[in-house]
Every structure is written in structure tokens, then in C-alpha cells.
């Protein structure tokens, strides 16, 4: 409705400015009327087709129902006749054997008839379900038809209203002056510009917030990068210092090994040709006498750090302890 009113107001404003649009308006209204009439005719045609289909289904269902009712009546008549025939045959004692055979045959026929009746009953139920579905579909189509009629009435009322509004607008369009129209246009332009300025202010504020956030994130990342670089430089300097210390220790070790290789000890009773000099054995005049008076305490030495003769003694004591625990 609002779109129609807005279109009408725009059409009125356009007609007041040029005569060409006044000539184009009746053709537009005529096209709208033609399209609505075509739609109404199409809906009427669909309604008639639906009514014809419903009538055909109703006639078919009634004919099938009458046919099955006649069949059921015929079968019941045959069943009654067979029962009467059997009751009369039972009175004759000489025909008992044939009566039994006939009874079995009748039972078989009765079973067949019952099965056929059950099948027909199922078929009847199926047809009833189809009829119910057709009724539901018919009801739905009737609802659609009612909706289409209401829509048709609504379109007709809307066309009448638009025609009336158009006629009223054509009648009162001469009363509007150019100053009023110009003033309304200027006010509309000012309002539109104010709205656009508000939107632009909001966009600028959003862009400014995004820029500040991005700048703070960039500064934080740069600070973290500098801290990591400092940590890396510190670690690298520590690694270089440790490498230099390791090299110095290796050189000192090689130097000590060379000095140890150049040192010889006098032969002893242990059977070894050469002896390394014990660093804890004092050298010089009177050192042997002092060593005998104060022998070194080897209980705090590791086994591989003891002199060879002390190692042999320690090994002997350990073997004795193993033998005599």
C-alpha cells in the first residue's frame, strides 16, 4: 500500500512538470488492468477445471461403490442358497458320503469367498482413503479458489482506490504552487545531507578506532620483537662464552694429559713397569720418612684415583669380603 501511495505521489510530481508523463499514465493503468484481468481469467479457468475433476472422481467412486455392493449381495445370496441346499441334503442318509464331499467343497468355496470378500473390503478401504485424499485436495483447492477470489476483490478495490486517488490528485494538482514544491525539495535535500553527514561521522569514528587499535597492536608486536631479540642476543653471548670455556677446558685437559705422559714413576712390587707419580706423595729430602710416619688416608679417594699398589690392596680386601661375608 505504501509503495502504491509513494508511486502515486511521484507520478503526480512528474505530471506537474511535463505533459508527456500525463499521456503515459493512462497506458500504464491500462496495462495494469489488462494484467489483472488475465490473472482473474486464469484463476477462473483453474477453478472450473478443479470442479470438473472433483465431479469426475465423485461419479467414479459412486459407480465403484454400487458395483461392490452388488457383488457382496450376490455372494451373500449364493451363500444362503448353498446353506439351504446343504440343509436339505443332510436329511438323506444314503448320500452322506457325497454330503461330506460337498461339505468340504462348500467349505473351500466359503474360504475362497471369504478371502475374496476380504480383498474387496481392503480395496474398498483403499478407495475410501483415496476418496478422503481427493476430498482433502478438493477442500484445499476450494480454499485456494476462495483466496483467489479474495485477492481478485482486493485487486479490484485497490484499482478503484487508485483510480479515485489518481482522479483526486489530477483534480488538486493545479492548486500546488511552484514555491511550495521548491521548498519541499530544498527541505528534503537538507534532510538527506544531514543524514549523510551523520553516516559519514559514524564511519570516520569507526575508521579512527580501527586505526588506533591497529597502531597499538603494531607497537605491542614491535616491543615483543625487541624483547625477543634481546633474549636471543643474551642467549647467543652465553652460548659463545660457554663454547670458549669448553675449548679452554679441552686445551687444559690436553695439556695435563701431555704432562702426565711425560711423568714416570720408579718400579714397585706391583709388577708394573711404569708408575704415575702420586700427586699426594711428597717429594724432596725427608719426604719418605714423613710418609711412613704419616701414611695418607685413602678412605676418601675413589678407587680409580688410588695408587696402583693401594688399588691392589683394596681389590684384595674386597675379594676377601666377598668370600667371607
UniProtKB/Swiss-Prot annotation:
GO terms for biological process: cellular response to lipopolysaccharide; inflammatory response; MyD88-independent toll-like receptor signaling pathway; negative regulation of canonical NF-kappaB signal transduction; regulation of transcription by RNA polymerase II; toll-like receptor 4 signaling pathway. GO terms for molecular function: polyubiquitin modification-dependent protein binding. Induction: By Listeria infection. Expression is slightly down-regulated by dexamethasone and slightly up-regulated by IL-10. Strongly induced mRNA and protein expression by lipopolysaccharide. Residues 17-28 have a biased composition (Basic and acidic residues). Highly expressed in lung, lymph node, thymus and fetal liver. Expressed at lower levels in bone marrow, brain, kidney, spleen, leukocytes and tonsils. Could be detected in heart, salivary gland, adrenal gland, pancreas, ovary and fetal brain. High levels detected in liver, colon, small intestine, muscle, stomach, testis, placenta, thyroid, uterus, prostate, skin and PBL. Keywords: Coiled coil, Inflammatory response. Binds to zinc finger protein TNFAIP3 and inhibits NF-kappa-B activation induced by tumor necrosis factor, Toll-like receptor 4 (TLR4), interleukin-1 and 12-O-tetradecanoylphorbol-13-acetate. Overexpression inhibits NF-kappa-B-dependent gene expression in response to lipopolysaccharide at a level downstream of TRAF6 and upstream of IKBKB. NF-kappa-B inhibition is independent of TNFAIP3 binding. This is TNFAIP3-interacting protein 3. It comes from Homo sapiens. The gene is TNIP3.
